[in-house]
Amino acid sequence: MRVLRAFSSPWLPAMSLLMAGAAAQASDAIGLPAPFGSANAPSSANTPPLANAAAATAHLSHGRFKDLLVYSPAGVPKSFVLFLSGDEGWNSAADAMARQLVEQGAMVAAIDWARFKANLEADGDECLFADGDLENLSHFVQAYFHAPTYLTPMLVGVSSGAAMAYSMLAQAPRNTFAAALTLGFCPNFNLQKPLCGGSGLKFARGTGGHGVDLLPIKNLGNPWVDLHGELDRSCPAGAAGNFISQVRGAAIVSLPTVTHDFTSPRGWMPQYTAGFNALVARNAAARTAPPPASLSDLPIVEVPAQPAAAPADVFAIIMSGDGGWAGIDQDVAAALSARGIPVVGLDSLRYYWTARTPSGLAADTDRMIRYYLTHFGKQRVLLIGYSQGADVLPFAVNRLPESSRARIALTAVMGMSEHALFEFHLSSWVSDSNSGPATLPEIDRITGMPVLCIYGADENDSLCPKLDPKRFIVVKLKGGHHFDGDYANLAHQILAAARPTSAE
C-alpha cells in the first residue's frame, strides 16, 4: 500500500501511519477466514479479520428506500454508515464489506445504488437533490432503532456508489456527513439526470454525452479517503489521483494488486478496515471540547470570537435547526465570531433526541446564559434560533427568570414555522408536522426586548408575515429556508436589530 497523496489536513498523517501498519501485515500470514484467505493461513492478532460473525439484520422502508437492509452491531453502535453499493446492486461483495464495518461497531444502512438511482431519476425535477434523502434516512433509521444519541453518518461507497458518496459530501451542507470512504472512485458518473449543485458540487456534461464528469472542489469540509487499485482498468488510479489531488483534505490509497472489482480482500481489506477506523477516530477527535461540568448534559458547541477592532459586549446562543449543528447554524456562528462575538450552539437534533418541555428548555437556557456571561466576560446575550430552534425559542424566553431576561439584547428567529416540537418522532422524518404547541401565541407574549423575525421570500409557511410589524422587526430576505446561503447578511441583520453593540 502506498499513499499517493495526502493533502493538507491534520488527521491524515495519523491515518497514513495506521493504514501503513495494516498494509505491512497484508501477507500470506494475514489470516483471513475462508473463502477469502488460505485455509492454512495463520492468524494475526494485530490484523483486523474479515467479519465472519453474524450481524443482526432488519428490513425497513422509508421515503425513496424500500425494503432497506440494516445491519446492527452487538451493543451500542459506535458509528453509523450509509453504504452505497456499485451498479450491481446489493450483492455478496457489498454484504461482506458491510459486515466488516459492523465488526468495527458500526450500524450500516445498505443502499442498493441501482434501485436508488432509478428512484431518483424517475422524479420530474430537472436536477437531483439526494443529500436530503440520505440525511433523512439517517435520522429515521437511528430513531427507529432507538439510538441513545444521534451519530453523524459516514458515507461509504463502491464504484458508482463511490462517485455518489463524493457527490453527497460536496452537495450537502458541511458536517451533514462525517466523512466519506470510497473504493474505486471515478469522476465519470453514469447519471441520466444531473445532480443539483447544492453547497458546492460541480460537474460537466460527460464525455460523449454520457452521464456527468464530476469536477473537484477545493475543500469538501469533511475528510474523504479513496482506496484505489493500481490494476483498475475501468478508472485508472492516475485519473482518480489527479482528481483527488485537487481536493483539500482528501487522500488516495494505492493498492498494488487490486482491480476495479475489489475481488481479492487480501489486497484491500486491512487498508479498508484501518481507514474506516481512522476516519471514525478522526470524527471523534474533531468534536469540540466537552462542555463544562455544569453543562455536561447538554449538546453544546463553543465558537470563540475572532479578534475584532472593537469587541462586542455580547455573546450569542444559537439553537440549531432539526438537522443538528451544521450548515446555516455554523455559518451564522462563524459570521458572528468574525465580528468579535463568541457563540454557544445548542445542537437541536441531539437535544430533542429525548423528550423535552418548554420549562426544561428555559431552565437549560438560563444555565447557559448565567455560565457564559461569566465565562466570556460579557454583559448581554443574543438569543437566536433557526428553524426548529426558532420555533422553540419563544417558549424558553417567556419562562426565563427575570435576571436572565434582563440580559437579553435581542431574540432573533429565522425560518420560524407555526408549531413547535420538543421531541423527535419518526413521523418528523416522513412529513411536515402540525402537531405541537402553536408558536404565534408564544412569540406574542414576549415583551421588554426587541424581537427579530427573518424569513425567506420563497418560504410559504413562515410565521413572520403574521406578526405585528409595530411590535416586531420583520425582515424578508431573498431565497427560501436557507436564505440563498447569504449568512453574512443574516449576521448583519441580527446585529442591526439588537440593542446597540460595538460589533457593528
Regions found by a protein language model. Name each.
Residues 124-147, 355-376, 395:
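Alpha/beta-hydrolase active-site loop
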Residues 144-145, 149-210, 380-434, 442:
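Primarily recognizes the serine-hydrolase "nucleophile elbow" in alpha/beta-hydrolase
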Residues 102-120, 336-353:
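Conserved alpha/beta-hydrolase
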Residues 190-245, 422-471:
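The feature captures the conserved acid-bearing segment of alpha/beta-hydrolase catalytic domains
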Residues 84-87, 230-233, 257-259, 319, ...:
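Acidic beta-to-alpha connecting loop that harbors the catalytic carboxylate
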Residues 250-301, 472-504:
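C-terminal catalytic histidine-bearing segment of alpha/beta-hydrolase fold enzymes
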Residues 30-37, 49-76, 270-309:
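N-terminal cap/lid segment of alpha/beta-hydrolase-fold proteins
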Residues 74-104, 306-339, 348:
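Short, surface-exposed "cap/lid" segments of acyl-processing enzymes
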